[in-house]
Amino acid sequence: RQMCIRDRYIEKVGKGVLGKNCERFENFPILIKLIDAKDNLSVQVHPDNEYAMRVEGEYGKTEMWYVVDCDEGATLLYGFKHEISKDEFARRIADNTLLEVTNAVPVKKGDVFFIKSGTLHAIGKGILIAEIQQNSNTTYRIYDYGRVGKDGKPRELHVDKALDVTKLAPAEQYPETPVEKKDGYDIKLLSKCEYFTTYRVNVETKAELEADENSFNSILVLEGEPVISGSETVSAKKGESIFVSAGTGKYTVEGKCTFVLTKID
């Protein structure tokens, strides 16, 4: 839920609510999702903007994952264990041995993964992920555990395109950043790129934040039931998303909670 249905709201009041830093984007720049994996999801890759525009006529995708919760022993796939050749990549897709060289990472609550375009990745069973991504649906499926679709046929793979765009090396993780202690809350930078900047915010009592003229703020609540007060006051529950317009100025988030804050720098 948001203060207004986002697209209708933007259409009604104008793109100024997105902020000056969003003027370089044709559409609303990000998608924010919660993904609850009840099974191993397909192994996939996203192209960069140049390839996606040339081949698909739309933008590529860079994204970030935040592990909201997970079962004990849960893992996800993130790049390769070591560098491999394009020929080996193609052979392993063909003979179903790809998982022997992919990097299976045990996860815990609070882990962060920066998934730059070209990075092979897959969410494993038993993981709840908050995903912040470029506003694009360009995805190339590489491996799907032999599953079939509703028509009884194996789901489509996009091997040739994946061979074009996949970085055949260990993934480039975003460097670890310190937690900054503030009055009533703490904040930690999770990732920063040309498409989005994300923070994890833990509120003990109250956080005083600001949505200036440069960017909207998006709040995705992971724990607690905060009250957000700015130009108006709304309450939010776990899993809900609140859109704070650029130019709102200072606003507060009150009540013990954890959320992912996203803006455009």
Name each region found by the language model.
Residues 140-216:
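C-terminal amphipathic alpha-helical segment
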Residues 37-40, 62-91, 203-231:
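Glycine- and acidic-residue-biased ligand/ion/polar-headgroup-sensing regions
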Residues 102-114, 230-248:
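Short acidic-glycine-tyrosine-enriched beta hairpin
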Residues 8-16, 29-56, 61-64, 176-208:
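A short glycine-rich, His/Asp/Glu-containing loop-to-beta-strand
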